[in-house]
Amino acid sequence: MVGPGVEEGDPLQIDADLARRWLVSFLKDELVRRRGFTKGVVGLSGGVDSSLTAFLAVEALGKENVIGVRMPYRTSSPESLGDALLVIQTLGIQSVTVDITAAVDGYLSQVERDGDADPTRRGNVMARQRMIVLFDLSAKYQALPIGTSNKSERLLGYFTWHADDTPPVNPLGDLFKTQVRALARHVGVPEVILRKPPTPDLVPGQTTEGDFGISYDKVDRILYYLIRGMKPAEVVARGFTPEEVAKVAGRLESTHWKRRLPTVAMMSQTAIGEFYLRPVDY
């Protein structure tokens, strides 16, 4: 999917049309042929990742077979809710809106005396509650949940374990955030969504790049070089500061456990996920 001449130019350049066709084929194969589903359900945050996922799902399955789900919390941005609705209306897909406020606050009120929790804990509860909704609606509509996480977030561990990473198929998981933006523009995701700063929308005013302290343009390129085996000093020589490289490398290393299934203590030669693998797992 990488465009020609990327070593001499932009290492993150992609052939957008080839990527689109491959991901549409991936969704058809993984949902329909391998798992026997004809429908998919996508959680729509109003951001570029979930919007692109919905566009690809519609091309793969047909608009009548894609369900877009909005799951606001009481502190969620009204703009995010509106942008998710714009995607629903643009694609003409069925939609469901489930307010998760009562579920999240109801739980926290039982484990905290004042019903309050630090922002990270509350955000994790929100993310996991959204997965409860998606998987329940999956059972209701017989529609497979489709993941929306990009490669940058996965490599940085910028997601809630057993939440954002839970859907069984993820078309964007091998695309850096900057590549997601390029592909989203190519397939026609509304410009208002492409222009706004990325945010998990878990805390009012929160932005992803604000949490990182570094832009996606830099993060993606640093990650690109690190996962190809470059040493930090070599990445610095590419035009980044030692602090920027150390920050990204530190997150890449410290969050590796989040990109794996639970670690099993092996007791036999048939340990699931270690020795017992189907051909498709290799």
Please give the residue ranges for each predicted region.
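ATP/NTP-dependent adenylation/nucleotidyl-transfer catalytic domains that generate, transfer
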Residues: M1-V42, L52, L56-E59, E64-R70, ...
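Conserved G/P- and acidic residue-centered "switch" motifs that form tight phosphate/ATP-binding loops
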Residues: G47
